[in-house]
């Protein structure tokens, strides 16, 4: 296993006082007005790491301790303020990604293609979010289209890692729509000293798509967001003999699939009062 503790926060951009955050109070506010301590992994950091999976991006924040076994798709745990990994809540646009069975989020299987910024709330937040947030909260904030256009991108990394993304955005008069499709493949990081190519692989194959539609006006707003992410993660399995030598090594594959549905609405009843509603679901 590999244990990484980020000690240098220079990669985490110091947000301006007017930067908007939603994690501290569950509503959009300027960072200068929120009482909680929040750091932000901002868009330029996310965009400079197009192939990076979520655990790699979170290592940019010095308040987070990360433990990951192997490379892409391998088990990763996040620790904040000395608490257990089940005490850090992970959200995407307000939707809980922690599973009911494990109590943690499958960080390695969360696609980061559409992430605008990552907000890290440091310290207890149980009053707002429940016991999952004793250590803190990590909120993934997705992008909202700002202009109409289409794009195709491709990225290449080490260990035969490839990522391609295709997408289109529409934004006009407060109405927006977005569609994305992406594919990530990697031969993975060698996790044993054995030279047998059949057991050294930690291959990862993941594909997904997302779509959103919304309207944003001064007095009201509504949006529908759907994303699906699936693939196969391969890891090495074996047993120890009487001398603690690994024997019977073989590749084991794990299929995964997750999907998020998020429907939100807002109506401003007055200058100081707004009504918010949300219907969301996460399947893993």
Regions found by a protein language model. Give the residues of each.
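Transmembrane beta-strand segments of Gram-negative outer membrane beta-barrel proteins
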Residues: 19, 116-117, 142-156, 177-181
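Extracytoplasmic beta-strand/coil segments of soluble accessory domains associated
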Residues: 55-95, 99, 116
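Hydrophobic, lipid-facing positions within transmembrane beta-strands of outer-membrane proteins
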Residues: 18, 76, 136, 148-150, ...
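Membrane-spanning beta-strand positions in outer-membrane beta-barrel proteins
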Residues: 89, 149-151, 161, 176-178, ...
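Periplasmic-side early beta-strands and strand-to-turn transitions of outer-membrane beta-barrels
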Residues: 139, 155, 167-257, 283
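N-terminal Sec signal peptide and the immediately downstream disordered periplasmic leader
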Residues: 1-49, 55-59, 169-170, 207, ...
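Short acidic/polar hinge/loop motifs at secondary-structure boundaries
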Residues: 95-122, 143
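Non-catalytic regulatory/gating segments with a bias toward low-complexity or hydrophobic composition
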Residues: 38, 46, 58, 118-120, ...
